[in-house]
Amino acid sequence: MTVEEFLERPERWDGNHEELIEGEIYLSPNNKPRHNIVVDRIQERLQPLKKQGFVVLGEVACRVSDSSLPNTDVAVIRQDRWEANGLDNFLPESPALVVEVASPNQMRKLLNKAALYLEYGAEQVWIAYPQKRVVQVLSADGSREAREAETVEFHGIVIPVSEIFPA
């Protein structure tokens, strides 16, 4: 299925939380409070990126290919790219940084999404695992896990992993 076919479906707008990944539709459950807290904490700590010409967004759909329109939990995109696209559309490309907060049983889907984001231009993808209190940092150079006593970094903004997850 293409992005156009996905968007033209009448049932697309019935309130389901769905996304298109490599031509397949994935439904996601409603986010739990812990998920939302982690998203909020990450967004808050990324706000200094605004001074570097970035926009920090919450959930947003990103068209990364003709057959993929995944949703991010947090997206960081350059201000000029955001303004060129307009404020009422999905992003036409992969953000510079994508953050996904993992829910149980989502590992395969999140790794597929991360590979897509990186293939289509993301500098980094962070996958936060609240149950393990770990952030997996993926980039074109490889992958590493940042544990609670460690930090994650994007364009000079350093975030202690311990500040991301609620007690």
What residues fall within each predicted segment?
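Gly/Pro/Ser/Thr-rich low-complexity, intrinsically disordered segments predominantly at protein N-termini
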Residues: 1-167
